[in-house]
């Protein structure tokens, strides 16, 4: 039987996630030579090279390394779960957690969650990473973020998730638009207007698919980089829009009213999820955040 240690496995995972030994050593608060020695010992025990080493280019996983990475993450996750089950943490936790979040949802959902979590764990530090669907997913898969809050359409089926909320699509209209006088607005009516979309692939495809599924081809007049710019353009009469994220106030940043109306057609809501890699190690702090978020 191969006699490796959990420390060697942990150092291997850290190096794979950071792409170089120096950064991995800093993250684990150990000396670089100790990190290099542990990885070398693991390669010797396994009889396989786990990394390609090229001067000035960092480290990349070999085929054997890529296979081992999934297994190593699963092994460390199991060890953490066993440890947590044997000695459940009591009282407030300390430590650091990196939380990714889809940028449109971040101001809508995170402040409330973080405020409540801070009351339970005042000494815990939660670092935030905000980005579009792709950036948040990559931060999760690459190990930068241990958890991520995003719409379900932004993640693959093999990523573990917990549903936090379900938000139905709705229409954004200029407050003075004739359609704003209706209690609900059909996709057919919206398809005749100038449509403003956020310039993100998953978002574009999702909202366009709602029209296509009902036999409509909308006219996209403009793309924006942010949700608030989209809302601002709608408020000032540049077009109409669809969204699932619904701020409490129906006004643009510069104070102009926006009319928000439900869609007449029955459309499935978008799920807001808290996501984590299936094979990722879940720290006690991450487990506490998951438990707290699921209760809210």
Where is each model-derived feature located?
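A short LG(V/I)-centered, amphipathic sequence patch enriched
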Residues: 43-63
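Hydrophobic two-helix hairpin corresponding to the core of helix-turn-helix DNA-binding domains
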Residues: 12, 24-25, 62-65, 117
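Alpha-helical linker/hinge and terminal dimerization helices associated
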Residues: 45-46, 68-90, 152
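Secondary-structure junction motif
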Residues: 193-214, 245, 249, 282-291
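Short helix-boundary/capping micro-motifs
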Residues: 13-31
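Central regulatory/effector-binding core of bacterial HTH transcription factors
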Residues: 94-156, 217, 224
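Interdomain hinge and pocket-entrance segments immediately C-terminal to HTH DNA-binding domains
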Residues: 57, 63, 87-106, 120-124, ...
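Beta-alpha-beta core module
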Residues: 157-168, 182, 189, 228-278
């Amino acid at each position: 039987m191969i006699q490796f240690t959990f420390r060697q496995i942990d150092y291997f995972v850290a190096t794979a996630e950071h792409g170089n030994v120096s950064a991995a050593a800093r993250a684990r608060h150990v000396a670089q030579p100790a990190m290099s020695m542990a990885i070398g010992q693991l390669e010797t025990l396994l009889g396989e090279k786990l990394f390609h080493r090229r001067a000035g280019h960092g480290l990349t996983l070999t085929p054997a390394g890529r296979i081992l990475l999934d297994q190593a993450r699963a092994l460390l996750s199991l060890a953490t779960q066993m440890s947590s089950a044997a000695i459940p943490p009591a009282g407030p936790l300390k430590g650091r957690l990196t939380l990714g979040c889809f940028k449109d949802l971040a101001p809508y959902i995170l402040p409330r969650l973080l405020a409540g979590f801070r009351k339970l764990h005042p000494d815990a530090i939660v670092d935030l990473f905000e980005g579009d669907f792709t950036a948040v997913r990559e931060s999760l898969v690459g190990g930068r973020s241990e958890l991520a809050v995003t719409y379900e359409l932004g993640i693959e089926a093999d990523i573990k998730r917990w549903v936090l909320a379900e938000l139905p699509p709705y229409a954004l209209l200029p407050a003075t638009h004739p359609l704003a006088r209706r209690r609900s607005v059909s996709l057919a009516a919206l398809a005749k207007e100038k449509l403003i979309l956020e310039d993100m692939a998953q978002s574009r495809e999702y909202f366009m698919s709602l029209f296509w599924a009902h036999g409509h081809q909308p006219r996209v007049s403009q793309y924006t980089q942010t949700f608030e710019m989209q809302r601002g353009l709608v408020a000032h009469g540049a077009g109409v829009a669809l969204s699932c994220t619904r701020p409490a106030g129906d006004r643009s940043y510069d104070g102009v009213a926006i009319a928000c109306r439900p869609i007449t057609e029955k459309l499935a809501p978008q799920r807001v999820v808290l996501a984590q890699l299936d094979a990722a190690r879940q720290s006690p702090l991450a487990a506490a955040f998951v438990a707290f978020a699921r209760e809210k």
